[in-house]
Curated annotation (Swiss-Prot):
GO molecular function per UniProt: 2 iron, 2 sulfur cluster binding; iron ion binding; oxidoreductase activity
GN (gene name): pdmA
Species lineage: Bacteria, Pseudomonadati, Pseudomonadota, Alphaproteobacteria, Sphingomonadales
Regulation: Activity is stimulated in vitro by coexpression of a [3Fe-4S]-type ferredoxin.
Domain of life of the organism encoding this protein: Bacteria
Organism for this UniProt entry: Sphingobium sp. (strain YBL2)
Subunit structure of this chain's protein: PdmA (subunit alpha) and PdmB (subunit beta) form the oxygenase component of a bacterial Rieske non-heme iron oxygenase (RO) system.
Entry keyword Transferase: no
Record's protein name: N,N-dimethyl phenylurea N-demethylase subunit alpha
Pfam families linked to this entry: Rieske
Length: 459
């Protein structure tokens, strides 16, 4: 019998293999083909291979705290419903009716026991089980097997510190295996307070006409751009730090599977009381945090070179900083997580969540939300800068002249060696210069694109 997934690879396979070869060879020389940021064939294979096999963040448990709660999300190009069913189980369901395929859910969030298809009225429980259809006995004469007609369920769904991830491949690694040592970094971010993090409202969403990988690799490892792209922030009244100082204090943490985080050695910027407290946490807030549950390497990292931004491959990023909610106020720490959601070649949608620690006062959290939106949002000081320059990269990626000339982008700063005295997980590089985390991202990207879809097609 004809199977599209058994033959679809034939047209593009040689092209993708050749591109992967050129990317790998280019990285050895510090170069990257520019058209990887806007190529229809590349985009299609990314959706088919990376986003159906990687663990992708879809929601936080505090978004669906009660039985019946749901949110509508994306895994690559697939729209999914993330639900909490009776008993507290979390489900990730493909948002398409098993009858004729239309969407069964059209709300971004809500609470319900069932989903009803608006086309022919097929009904499903909020865990995806098929319940019935109008005149089912007359229409189908008992031939409709309810056990085989539920909404498609993601085969793997796991939560880590409240962050819900899904993997659409039954044969993929567990979430723990996929995260690997980067879980050590996530622990340090989330477990500063035993109550953990919570979302501060629904995610903001906005379009940037650029490739999803640009945001991901930037947050994973690009300290170098801050002194130039964000220099305009110096002219505002919201921040006292000179953006050019980041050239002296940057660094990065590299982890397996393409994950990476960046830091500013804030203890060098503001002295021994830097690190975690340099973010602007006031004494009353500091009292609520506890470092005793961390190992010695985590404590040292948090107090001397804490994570400022990072990316969990492929497209889930983190950022923490401090700005005043209003000009002239004291700075307030904000914690931001976001998805670089692919839409089409050269276009992504940013899904932007503000977080805070669950036990902190509501007044503080309101200020943290305002500070986070001021810095990173559709109208944020930093996102406006990034959007403007990132769009130019995607334009070059689609340039007929640039493609004809095989324009290569430069990823060849000095080769920096990891700090041999570092005792934490992963590798630590105490330097702004050196694109170790971007290279790490791209080598994982090549690895995923080389994973031939034929390997998972049943005989």
């Amino acid at each position: 019998m004809f199977r599209y997934d058994q033959v679809a690879h034939l047209t593009d396979q040689a092209y993708i293999d050749d591109l992967c070869d050129r990317v790998e060879q280019g990285l050895d020389q510090g170069l990257l083909p520019s058209h990887v940021f806007r190529d229809e064939r590349v985009f299609k294979v990314e959706m088919d291979r990376i986003f159906t096999r990687a663990w992708v963040f879809v929601a936080h448990e505090t978004e669906i705290p009660k039985s019946g709660d749901f949110v509508l999300r994306k895994v690559g190009l697939d729209q999914v419903i993330v639900t909490r069913s009776a008993g507290g189980a979390i489900n990730v369901l493909l948002n398409h009716c098993r009858h004729r395929g239309t969407e069964v859910c059209h709300e971004d969030s809500g609470n319900t026991t069932h989903f009803k298809c608006p086309y022919h009225g097929w009904i499903y429980k909020n865990d995806g089980d098929f319940v019935g259809a109008p005149a089912m006995r007359e229409a189908y004469g008992g031939r409709l097997d309810s056990k085989k007609n539920g909404l498609l369920r993601a085969p793997q769904v796991e939560s880590y510190h409240g962050f819900i991830f899904t993997c659409l491949s039954e044969s993929g690694p567990s979430l723990s295996e996929y995260l690997g040592d980067v879980s050590w970094m996530l622990d340090a971010i989330v477990k500063l307070h035993p109550a953990g993090l919570k979302v501060l409202g629904a995610p903001e969403r906005f379009i940037i006409r650029t490739d999803w990988k640009i945001g991901a690799e930037n947050f994973a490892g690009d300290v170098y751009h801050i002194a130039t792209a964000h220099l305009s922030v110096n002219e505002t009244k919201y921040i006292s730090q000179d953006m050019r100082d980041t050239l002296k204090t940057g660094g990065g943490y590299r982890f397996q599977n393409g994950h990476g985080f960046i830091t500013h050695r804030s203890s060098e910027m503001v002295g021994a009381e830097g690190g975690l407290w340099a973010y602007g946490l006031n004494p009353e807030i500091r009292k609520q945090f506890d470092l005793e549950g961390f190992d010695d390497a985590q404590k040292k990292m948090l107090l001397e070179a804490p994570p400022v931004a990072g990316n969990i491959f492929p497209n889930f990023s983190y950022l923490r900083g401090a700005l005043p909610a209003n000009a002239g106020d004291l700075p307030v720490v904000f914690t931001n997580f976001r998805l670089w959601q692919p839409v089409e070649p050269g276009v992504m949608e940013v899904w932007n969540w503000q977080f805070s620690y669950d036990a902190l006062p509501d007044e503080y959290n309101r200020e943290a939300y305002a500070a986070g939106q001021l810095a990173f949002s559709a109208a944020g000081l930093f996102d406006q800068d990034d959007s403007a320059v990132w769009e130019g990269v995607a334009k070059l990626g689609g340039s007929p002249w640039g493609r004809k000339e095989e324009v290569m982008l430069h990823y060849g700063q000095q080769r920096v060696e990891p700090d041999s005295t570092y005792e934490g997980k992963g590798d630590y590089f105490p330097s702004t210069f050196g694109e170790f985390n971007q290279e790490n991202f791209w080598r994982e990207w090549v690895k995923q694109l080389r994973s031939d879809v034929r390997n998972e097609v049943p005989a």
